[in-house]
Amino acid sequence: MSYEKVLQAGKIVIGTKQTIRALKEGEATEVIVAEDADLPIIEKVTAAANEANVPVTKVDSMKKLGKACKIQVGAAAVAILR
């Protein structure tokens, strides 16, 4: 499951802006997006990932994604770094 990938990942960035920055800089190997995030956010992150040829995995909950990142709030997007 993708939540476990986030937990086991060595380096991650949390949040839409940081995820898009990591994609543009070629640092991301995979992107995790929460399906309950706002649609424009999902579309923006997915488009940036497609442009960078980075796979996108969708999970059901921002809250669970945030918890997997060990933060107390939800996370719309997370990038796993090289």
Swiss-Prot record:
> What Pfam families does the record point to?
Ribosomal_L7Ae
Q: Name one GO molecular function term.
A: RNA binding
Per its UniProt record, what InterPro entries does this chain match?
Answer: Ribosomal_eL30-like_sf, Ribosomal_eL8/eL30/eS12/Gad45, RNA_bf_YbxF-like
* Alphabetized Gene3D superfamilies for the sequence: 3.30.1330.30
Q: Tell me which domain of life the UniProt entry assigns to the organism this sequence originates from.
A: Bacteria
Question: What keywords does the record list, in alphabetical order?
Answer: RNA-binding
The yes or no answer to whether the keyword RNA-binding is present is yes
By sequence similarity, the record places it as follows: Belongs to the eukaryotic ribosomal protein eL8 family.
What is the protein name stated in its UniProt record? Answer: RNA-binding protein YbxF
Q: Which gene encodes it?
A: ybxF
